[in-house]
Amino acid sequence: MWPAYFVVAPGRKRVPSLLLSTAARDPWKPYPVPRFEPFAAIRYATDDLASLVAPPYDVLSDADIDVLKARSPHNIVRIDVPRGGEDRYVLAAKTMRAWLNDGILTMDSEPSFTVYRMRFTDSTGVRRDIAGVLGGLEVVDAEAGGVLPHERTTAAASTDRLDLTRATAANLSPVWGLSLAGGLTELLAEPGEAVGAVIDEGVEHLAERVTDQERIAAIHQRLASDDVLIADGHHRYGVARMYRDETREATGRSDTPAELTLAFVNELIEDQLSVAAIHRLYTGIEIADLADALGRSFELIATERPNSKSLATLQQEGFLILVGRDAAWQMRAKPGRFDGVRPLDGGWLETALADIPLTVSYQHGLDATLSEVDSGHASAAVLIRPVSVAEIERTAREGLLMPPKSTFFRPKLKTGFVIRSLT
């Protein structure tokens, strides 16, 4: 097992943290940073993966799953999103074993890291080349530090992911982490051995295996020098913690593969992140009442319903947009109303509507959000601005938490490039 490191990064500010504990922490005390280790990956035997990989399970509709299953009898959704009754997890595990026995899936003969690149043009016309690394990220206790959430999470109502992990004894889809260690992007610039490429919806996804021991050590040591912030996959990481605890109780050991979980980690810097907003949908309240409630905290100016171009312009000017079926308003915070509140649209809305009886849900994408309002599924929506990368870094550095569903990281990682065995 690779060694663990305990450091305080130069210039790192440690403060009492709403994130980790209500108790004050010694700002000069060294806290553990997580291990990040290579492993012998399970991969498809072919590098022609277009019909085999899939988006993450939590963004797939039933129709999406049908389309993916129709592409190939070996598409990863047949394991990652099993259908059926109570035996569906057992069937998923049997399918995975059968694919391994039949050579559809193969396990590498030695531990490796996998460099994962996503190349695309974002919604602003900027060319992006996001480079991260797939490996085994240490599963730490909720208050231990090292692996940090960046937003409050809603309670998971289903045990689906834990049941699937128990049955398959595998990590099927990665957590997305952001490393606060500088220089990771430069370290990943050199290509590795190509093991798969897919182009989907304008995004080129590439996977490259790294087995060179010096390069593995360099990546490991760089990631061992600072914290990792969870960008996407808070629930998956929580499931990994539950599975680790079950394994410890069953085996009496703390050195099994369950001590780590599959993660993609890239550097927390501006050119390595593409962050979109997750808009707010409101039900249980009439649009007039919602406008009245928001009008106590925001200046509301009647406007036309925005399109993608006008929304971007309004957001750059500092506006949020309240949208109903037949009306829309520009919203600008009243002077002094949110003094002492972090400059996050989601937090401002929570503060403004704290005493108003309503239900809030979340939707990314302008068209999908407006569709929810037009269909009557929501009374109204508030279109919010994307969170800045600087504010995400502040969240990590100061041990803070954003409101739920504050960030939507794009593009979504594909499931199926790499599977990590837990046996």
Language-model segments: which ranges?
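Aromatic (phenylalanine/tyrosine) cluster motif
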Residues: 5-6
